[in-house]
Design a protein with these regions (language model features):
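Buried hydrophobic positions in well-ordered alpha/beta secondary-structure cores of metabolic enzymes
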Residues: 50, 70, 145-147, 212, ...
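Short glycine-cluster motifs
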Residues: 14-17, 64-144, 148-153, 157
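Low-acidity, Ser/Thr- and Arg-rich intrinsically disordered low-complexity segments
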Residues: 407-408, 413, 422
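Active-site nucleotide/adenylate-binding loops and adjacent lid/helix of ATP-dependent enzymes
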Residues: 48, 55-66, 74, 97, ...
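Structural motif
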Residues: 4, 118, 144-148, 181, ...
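Gly/Pro-rich active-site capping loops and adjacent beta-alpha segments
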Residues: 341-368, 372
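Peripheral docking tails and interdomain loops at the edges
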Residues: 5-93, 166-261
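Glycine-rich beta-alpha junction loops
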Residues: 7-12, 72-77, 98-99, 123, ...
Length: 426
């Protein structure tokens, strides 16, 4: 059937509100998303979407394609559901020419035929015509179809006028076998007795347009996870809480180089004299960086594309005067013609395991927040999919980056009883 989860802890306030046993489950939110993705668990944000998602899974299981259709007797509803679905991973396929002709014959010349379909109210009391209309739409065999219907309160007015549409959708469901959900705009517009009636006929009762669509996405994510290759066993154990520490860039690159990752030529120095001596080893442009800051740009602790020794001296003097290099300097080979920076990070999350972060690097990385997180170990297929999901994927030379990343032992399978040494804190 699949698993749906709501996990608190996105915001700082939510993290502070979790106490006792729930606090131990809050953990790192990015880590939770990565772990759920790995395990094929679909995460939703609201109780309404949680219940709607369970309803879809209960009546037919996960979705395996993103194709949907919608029927309503209001143009406003048709437009609204189209707008709500637009940012999601759902698709409204166009009707075929045959379907358009058949629906035009059923609904008349005044109704525009499109998906989502506004069938209007010309045939509202004609059960036979409604059945023909609904059946024709369901024949397209989209993964899930929605019929938007809002029912009046029984204590305020009669709902007998809705019976032709109810009987019509039940008949269309039986004749086509397609998956169909009756979707009410508001919770109070679909009573429990109506929901039970629809369920008895194999029709999914859902409430809330936005929530109904997001529940379809949740069911789709589960279906997609079932089709993925079997992932390696997770790298996780009950690690002791240890205070983290920051290695300087020079030491970090030494670690990377020792495990097979290519790094630029780099030297660390303490004085101007040592810097000028080390500079002789470099053949092209260099970068000068101050040691002692996790984020160098904020402290003016970096100077790029230095081509002359005089410019190098000026950059060093400026950093010394501003206190931008409290622990010395790094001189590094400047990489020419860099098209884009890729951020690769590793974090040990005690609640979820080791996380690999892939994303856009550079000075705007935290503003753009274009990252994907994976729990280790990972396969090349998982890395490819993560890179393709980035906003900058259009600019990535996928073969180059994938080869560079997957050739590193950092993302290869590792024994589950111990963590790679290069990401264990000292």
């Amino acid at each position: 059937m699949g698993i749906i989860a709501i996990k608190v802890g996105k915001s700082k306030a939510a993290q502070e509100a979790t106490v006792s046993h729930t606090a131990s489950l809050a953990g790192n939110d990015s880590g939770a998303n990565a772990l759920f993705e790995r395990l094929g668990i679909s995460r939703v944000d609201t109780i309404e979407t949680f219940l709607n998602s369970l309803m879809i899974l209960h009546e037919g299981g996960p979705l395996f394609r993103n194709t949907i259709s919608s029927m309503s007797c209001s143009g406003g509803e048709a437009s609204l559901i189209a707008d709500l679905a637009d940012p999601l991973t759902l698709d409204f396929p166009e009707f075929t020419d045959i379907q358009i002709n058949n629906l035009s014959s059923i609904l008349g010349p005044l109704v525009h035929i499109a998906n989502p379909l506004d069938y209007q109210t010309y045939i509202w009391h004609d059960q036979e015509k409604l059945t023909e209309c609904f059946t024709e739409v369901l024949k397209c065999k989209n993964e899930l179809s929605f019929l938007i219907m809002d029912f009046p309160r029984k204590d305020k007015c009669h709902d007998t006028a809705w019976e032709p549409a109810i009987n019509a959708i039940i008949s269309a469901k039986k004749s086509t076998g397609s998956r169909i959900a009756v979707l009410a705009s508001l919770d109070e517009n679909l009573s429990e007795d109506k929901a039970i009636r629809f369920l008895s006929e194999g029709i999914i009762p859902l409430t809330g347009l936005d929530s109904g669509l997001k529940s379809a996405v949740a069911a789709l994510k589960i279906g997609e996870s079932w089709r993925k290759s079997l992932a390696p066993k997770l790298l996780w154990k009950n690690w002791a809480e240890i205070e983290s520490q920051i290695e300087n860039e020079f030491e970090s690159k030494k670690i990377l180089k020792n495990i097979g990752v290519k790094v630029p030529q780099v030297e660390i120095v303490k004085s101007k004299e040592e810097l000028l001596e080390k500079y002789k080893k470099f053949k092209g442009s260099v970068t000068l960086k101050g040691v002692g800051h996790a984020h160098k740009s904020e402290h003016s602790a970096i100077a790029l594309d230095i081509r002359k020794i005089d410019d190098l001296t000026v950059a060093l003097d400026n950093m010394q005067k501003s206190g931008a290099a409290p622990k010395g300097f790094i001189i590094e080979e400047f990489i020419q013609n860099g098209r884009i920076e890729l951020l690769i990070g590793f974090v040990r999350d005690n609640a979820h395991g080791f996380l690999l972060t892939l994303g856009e690097g550079g000075v705007l990385s935290e503003i753009r927040n274009d990252t994907q997180n994976l729990v280790l170990p990972v396969s090349e297929e998982m890395i490819v999919n993560a890179l393709k999901s980035l906003k900058i994927s259009f600019a990535l030379d996928l073969f180059f980056f994938i080869e560079a990343i997957t050739s590193s032992p950092a993302v290869k399978s590792a024994p589950t009883d111990k963590a790679p040494k290069y990401i264990e804190p000292k």
